[in-house]
Amino acid sequence: MAGHNKWSKVKHIKAKEDAKKGKVFTKAVRDIMTAVRDGGPNPDTNAALRLAIERAKAVSMPQDNIKRAIDKASGNLPGVKYEEITYEGYGPGGVAIMVECLTDNKNRTVASVRHAFSKSGGSLGTSGSVSWMFEKKGVITVERDENEDAIMEAALESGANDILEFDEVLVIETDPADFNQVLEAVEKAGAKILESSVGLVATNEIDVDDATAEKVERLIDMLEENDDVQNVYHNMK
């Protein structure tokens, strides 16, 4: 029985590790697909895609998975037509939520998204109901180090709009059109880039209590479990 118990624990640990790896792979795939949609499928001319591929390789994602993600985002999978759809609505506590999807079946996707909102006490809205609370920006997160002055200078000189300083990271914001050139500039300046993407940023964040925050996080988790969902944005602090 001791051996059985030990194996049960090993299986449990392996299941947790597999789940963790699955989430890491899912994020890597989404980062690649977002980069392709924003800047095209060529990593030689799309710095965000090149970095997303490097991050995917760093977590041991197979090359076939990387290629499939690029082909899916660029519409090159044979016999399948994907389209981009954005859903918007309110989560618990009136938190505004935007859900970017890439799907080959709109009916399936909207049913899944609506179910997640309803189950979490939120409501799926109509087009334009919350999108006015967000603006599209390039966001580059880099690690702070002794080279940060040169990194900030490179970012600003290449067109960055703002740099937010936190304890361990710098968050560089750009116009979408300037994103790639700023990304390349800070990379050349020696920045260790942790995340980089063009996405939606809330223009005004709202405070919610801990219980509401947990409900919103559960809604986001439910949405992100859907393979059709590419990105989820919200205005919760």
UniProtKB/Swiss-Prot annotation:
GO terms for cellular component: cytosol. Its main location: cytoplasm. The keyword Glycoprotein does not apply. One of its GO terms (molecular function) is DNA binding. It is found in: Cytoplasm. Keywords: Cytoplasm, DNA-binding, Transcription, Transcription regulation. SUPFAM superfamilies: YebC-like. It comes from the Bacteria. GO terms for biological process: regulation of DNA-templated transcription. Belongs to the TACO1 family. This is Probable transcriptional regulatory protein NIS_0560. It comes from Nitratiruptor sp. (strain SB155-2).
